[in-house]
Amino acid sequence: MSVITVSGVVLRADDGALLTVRKRGTSRFMLPGGKPEPGEDALAAAVRECREELGVDLTPESLELVGTFRTAAANEPGHEVIGTIFTHAAPPDVAPAAEIAELRWLDPTGPLPDDLAPLLAERVIPAILGRSTVERARVAHRGSSPI
């Protein structure tokens, strides 16, 4: 199986919501980010992609590493993605640019929509919340905290 390497940024609002984007010609929402250019490391790619996709200028030292995760690619059937993910407070003004067709704020503690990229739904959100997807499903189903 082919592997695609990407960088992404969790932009979190003061209320805990995180920004998701949908790229033109796709149906899945994901984090802002993308593939590094030749010679570019994960951090530099994350900064560049946020500037290109959202018009926001982040500095490398302002990003905090969440982790590196591997799962099925959202828009490339038969591929896996390895994503290095960073976090940053959401800037006040973000607007779709470049290939971004739509922005959507997401409450990661609530029920997750079905149109999220696997990297975001299966790996990143559980990592930032500190619990597994299975544990979240149990909580949502029972309406109570896990034991």
PLM segments and residue spans:
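Conserved N-terminal beta-strand and adjoining loop/helix that marks the start
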Residues: 1-18, 35
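NUDIX/MutT-family hydrolases
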Residues: 85-87, 95-130, 142-145
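Actinobacteria-biased recognition of intrinsically disordered, low-complexity terminal regions
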Residues: 1, 133-147
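Short loop/turn segments immediately following the C-termini of beta-strands
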Residues: 23
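Active-site-adjacent beta-strand/loop module that shapes the phosphate/pyrophosphate-binding cleft
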Residues: 69-95, 127
